[in-house]
Amino acid sequence: KHKNENINREMVVQNTLTFDITKQLTLNADYSFKWRLKEISNRSVKVPYSSKEGTTDYIDNFRSVDSYHQQLARYQTHNYNVYLRWAPTWDRHSLTLTAGYNGEMYRYHSLEAERLDLMTEDLSSFNFAKGEVTELSESIKTYATNGFFARVNYNWAERYLFELSVRADASSRFAPGYRWAVTPGGSCGWRMSEEPFWEEI
């Protein structure tokens, strides 16, 4: 009557919002939530054998134990993203300004227990166990991240391209005083194929 059971339940929710404030200004936001529940249970019973008629013995090894083991674990993840985009154009100039925020929150909670000697082989429950508690543990893990960003893109006639950006990111996994990091960046480009002289080549 050994029995192993593994149950997984999962739920995912996603929402997205796009709002055109003006023709050139847009607000974008999205949120997602993921929830998962995992349940693992193991029921072991002693394995009987008979060496002669009228007697019953039990195999004496780690596989022949009357026990019930259960683990319950729950996972939760929240993700947030919000950013504003402004993209004006005039003459042969194009400018795009983007600024926003993203964040994540994660939590894991697990309970695990095992107890020996159940009163009946037909029921798997700690309520029917009267033996030693061989395992009882709990695990909790959490973390959160936050990030702010800004970016400027400019191009003239799709020929000369410039970009400047900066990010500020933080994580609860690092010690206080060391959680934030600021990362600037920049680039420029020249699309030679858009030059008038290229048409003559």
Language-model regions: role of each:
Residues P88, E121-F126, R159, S172, ...:
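Flexible, active-site-adjacent loop/turn segments at secondary-structure boundaries
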Residues K1, N42-D66, R107-L136:
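Surface-exposed loop/turn segments flanking beta-strands in extracellular/periplasmic regions
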Residues G100-N102:
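N-terminal glycine-rich FAD/FM-binding segment characteristic of electron-transfer flavoproteins
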Residues T89-R92, W156-E158, G189-I201:
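Secondary-structure transition/capping motifs at alpha-helix termini
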Residues L37-N42, K46-V47, K52-E53, H93, ...:
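Outer-membrane beta-barrel proteins
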Residues K1-H2, D60-H69, R85, A129-S137, ...:
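Extracytoplasmic loops and strand-loop junctions of Gram-negative outer membrane beta-barrel proteins
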Residues H2-N42, Y68-T89, T96, Y108-S110, ...:
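Outer-membrane beta-barrel transmembrane strands
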Residues A181-W190:
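Feature captures outer-membrane beta-barrel proteins of Gram-negative bacteria and organelles
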